[in-house]
Amino acid sequence: FPAAARHRRGLQTCSRYQTLELEKEFQCNPYLTCKRWIEVSHALGLTERQIKIWFQNRRMKWKKREQRQVPQQQMGAGGAGETETGIGPRGGR
């Protein structure tokens, strides 16, 4: 095994309080500056790296949700979904 694989850290979870505070911060700004990473890490008792990775993961979750919503909105606007009778294109529901 490579040296990096042997020294891999376990999954570190945030407390409910930390998660709520990170979510509040994300709502204000999804991109933090290095200075803000430091401030948030000290306030929440997490490392700067944990803050940085949490925000990277949260932005990916945000983007995936947005991508899922766009096709649904297009289908709702008269796409190839159900007809007025509620029956799909192949006769099934």
Swiss-Prot record:
Its main location: nucleus. GO terms for biological process: anterior/posterior pattern specification; negative regulation of myeloid cell differentiation; regulation of transcription by RNA polymerase II. It is found in: Nucleus. Residues 64-93 are annotated as: Disordered. Residues 7-66 bind DNA. GO terms for molecular function: DNA-binding transcription factor activity, RNA polymerase II-specific; RNA polymerase II cis-regulatory region sequence-specific DNA binding. GO terms for cellular component: nucleus. PROSITE patterns: HOMEOBOX_1, HOMEOBOX_2. Forms a DNA-binding heterodimer with transcription factor PBX1. Belongs to the Antp homeobox family. Sequence-specific transcription factor which is part of a developmental regulatory system that provides cells with specific positional identities on the anterior-posterior axis. This is Homeobox protein Hox-B8. The gene is HOXB8.
